[in-house]
Amino acid sequence: EGTRVRVKVERAGGKKPIEFDIVRGGVPFPSIRSHFMLNSRVGYVGLSAGFQETTADELDVAIKDLKKQGMEALILDLRNNVGGLLPQAIEVTSRFVEKGKTVVSVKGRSNYSEAQELKSVGGTTYEFPLVVMINGGSASASEIVAGAIQDYGRGLVVGSESFGKGLVQKIYPLPYGTGLTLTTARYYTPYGRSLQRDYSNGSIYDYFSHSDGPNGGEPADTAKEAVKPKGKPVTTAGGRIYYGGRGIEPDLKAPPLELTTLRYRLSEAAFFFVRDLTAGQIEGFENYKTPKQSFATVLKQGDIVIPDSLFSRFVEFAVGDKENGLTGANIESQASFARSRIREQLATARYSGEAGFQVLLENDPQVLKAIDAIPEARSLAKKIMAKNSDRLE
């Protein structure tokens, strides 16, 4: 770390490689990869990289920045968050749930097994409307956060059913580099729902097919049969009835953006087209050449527009590549999707990967559903504030 290395980079359309002097250093791996305003009032925080030692502090920094930009409501995206450190899940939940309330319970099989309630630690408590997004890739610590928010009616949960990983396990080392993983307890939401998905009537296929099915986290038909609710119904503070043993079921279900084979091919074509476009290699559109990224730029709606002339040139470019199997007709049938992917790649090339991701979310059906849920989330937040106010009087 701290030493220098010279790297040669060959770019599309470049006459010769470009040399850069780079100083070696640590590569940061934050829990929150992106945060920005979805519109003038709704902020977005993408907590996708697990729960690490800095997660709660990262959330505070992101929220502080969004509030400066006028945020009045927050969408916390826990989709594809596979979990992580339990104390950080408690800390994050504590930002929205008042001190002393149970966040998660740990219960063993018998009365002699370990049993404990982990409670909100207090500190900064945010009172703005909250929507939490989950999907079949949301597991463990992310389910603990979503479950507590849902049970207490502090916010709405939007998306598709979570993975359902709620086991407390210990690893006992064995010879030859092996080990035995022993399940000692289960996690339960504050109102008593088991987070662990019940596969007692299922198979190993059902377990692994849950998070990667074509329905964005909804179990395949065989898995649905295996996870029919068996426990007692639980009524949350928000007035909804849910069962344990199936992960977290969203308050409002929304399908993910479907990625068909055609859309994968269009995404690939958009990448190569914008690569040449920003290198100044698309004749007639040399003004799109981008020498370097402008990381400090805050992307706003309408910043990147794809004129019809540029889209027509993309169609020519894509059809000209005989290997991708694209035709003018099937590209036109997905014109809106293709334009979105071109905008995404342009935003990435001009500004940053975060800017490109922001463009992608503009047409994400689950994000759009979360935005539509803000008024209901606002009503829930007002009820919580009214209860807290009455308690103080």
Residue ranges and their predicted role:
Residues 141, 147, 153, 160, ...:
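Polar, glycine-rich mid-to-C-terminal structural blocks
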Residues 40, 80-81, 119-120, 156, ...:
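Generic detector of intrinsically disordered, low-complexity, polar/charged segments
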Residues 21-25, 35-38, 58-63, 92, ...:
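Generic preference for flexible, low-structure residues
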Residues 194-195, 199-393:
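Conserved functional hotspot residues or short segments at active or partner-binding sites
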Residues 55-62, 67, 88-92, 99, ...:
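Stable alpha-helical elements in mature extracytoplasmic
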Residues 7, 17, 22-23, 27-32, ...:
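Sparse, context-dependent recognition of short Cys/His-centered cofactor- or disulfide-binding micro-motifs
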Residues 1-177, 186:
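Cleft-lining beta-strand/loop regions that shape enzyme active-site pockets
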Residues 45, 181-182, 243:
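Generic recognition of long tandem-repeat/solenoid scaffolds
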